[in-house]
Amino acid sequence: MHWSESLLKDVSGDQRISTGISPSGPIHIGNMREILTGDIIYKEALKLGIKASFIYLCDDMDPLRKVYPFLPGSYERYVGHPLSMIPAPDGDKTYSEYFLEPFKETIDKIDVRPEIISTTSLYKNGVLSRAIDIAMNNREKIKNILNSIGNYKITGDWYPYEPVCKSCGRINTTTVISYNYPYAEYKCKCGYTGKADIRTDDGKMPWRVEWPAKWFSLHVTIEPFGKDHGAAGGSYDTGKAIASDIFNINPPLPLLYERIFLKGKGVMHSSTGVVIPASEMIKFSPPEIIRFLIAKNNPGRHIDFDPGPGLLNLIDEYEKYERAYFGLDSVKDDDYKEVYELSRLKILKEPEKITFRHIVTLVQIYNNNDALLSALKRSGYEKDYIDDYIMNEIDTARYWLEKYAPPEMKFSLTDENINLNDDERKIVNEFLENIDNIEWSPDSIHNYVYDIIGRSKMRPQDAFAVFYKILIGRSRGPRLGYFIYNLGREYIIKRFSSILAETF
């Protein structure tokens, strides 16, 4: 049973799945685990006949906590200001919109379409005002919950509300000194004293109170979140208590997920600069792959993401799942059909005939689309034009090669002469002798080369190196059968014959 189905097996009634983020910096691949986990639960719920909705909360009332490495020093003046009330780095719109907009474009391209809700709008439109009032009138109980469960040390006359100072604009330097609905009187460290209207975006609740207040106000029933929130005494533990004891609701069904690590660099985090923006991934990877990465891995398992060679291995694995789905291969995963369906933007009638790895090879051989189309057709592609799907794969492969491929995976054809010893000449000569008689297919070529090597005195790796040196000037390269096949019989005969003639 897939992890999403397992989560939903005992739920009843309508479900609202909630996810969210504080848009303090570039929204990256690591952040994608939450929204994709939510989307997968949502789609599985619909498949099971459960009436469900899916929301994504943009926590844009959160303050800017520091000047991050990607910001100019001038942003020091905005530290402590709500993200929705700070100008964008490019001067257009707000800070939060600047980072949210490319993310919205990205998730649309991978078929994730939640209702995106600004937390600022929830405050501004009074959606959270009832919850704020309840919290303010139960502040001692909430203080006791935070102190006893969350190990806080809150003392004195504390209120669960943080006004935005009308003088300096900061939200993290104010303290409420009295409350009389709907106004919270406050003082700020800047010296200003004023009133905040809880029915507007004059302020916000602290996170540990705001989270259960959102569950209450938005009727949230399921929420995936990072394991740090689920630690003992963490925000989910205090949230559960506030939900039941203060708001008189059941907390949402939780699903804790592990982090995504960037291979060789650790946990992805905007504040450290260890990120690959989500918008970047769909430039160097087919859109189904990020969905596949999340769908196939249990949320409790951490993911090591490698945008280099590991990406090709991940795509190979996805394509194997696709072939298994159509009965053409097998995988060691009982949930392979579910994983594949949850990965796809649109279910195909048959598997794609051209692998991404193959396209990575082709785009390094052929520079123009006419030659590419001919090579694709030799590989089983049946259309007389390059359709949008394959064109996207071509563009994606080129981008990946330019930005992320390691040097050993890049190549260009060479016409330089190389010197062969007697054993090497013998292999090349035997290869040419019967090349006109073999079936021109990757498997036939592969087997033909292996037969020749088996009869020679050379080690297989040394023999393969001869072929690669002749073709690309180095000892390793793409899978040889496919590579020779795509270069074409005529090119291979001409190139190998010229080498034999030069070294005769």
UniProtKB/Swiss-Prot annotation:
UniProt entry tagged with the keyword tRNA processing: no
A single cellular component GO annotation: cytoplasm
MF GO annotations: ATP binding; lysine-tRNA ligase activity; tRNA binding
Principal location class: cytoplasm
GO biological process: lysyl-tRNA aminoacylation
InterPro entries from the UniProt entry: aa-tRNA-synth_I_codon-bd_sub2 (IPR020751), aa-tRNA-synth_I_CS (IPR001412), aa_tRNA-synth_I_cd-bd_sf (IPR008925), Lys-tRNA-ligase (IPR002904), Rossmann-like_a/b/a_fold (IPR014729)
Motif 'HIGH' region mapped to chain: 23-31
Keywords: Aminoacyl-tRNA synthetase, ATP-binding, Cytoplasm, Ligase, Nucleotide-binding, Protein biosynthesis
Transmembrane segments: none
Catalytic activity annotation: tRNA(Lys) + L-lysine + ATP = L-lysyl-tRNA(Lys) + AMP + diphosphate
Localisation per UniProt entry: Cytoplasm
Its EC number(s): 6.1.1.6
HAMAP family (alphabetical): Lys_tRNA_synth_class1
Entry's family note: Belongs to the class-I aminoacyl-tRNA synthetase family.
Protein name per its UniProtKB record: Lysine--tRNA ligase
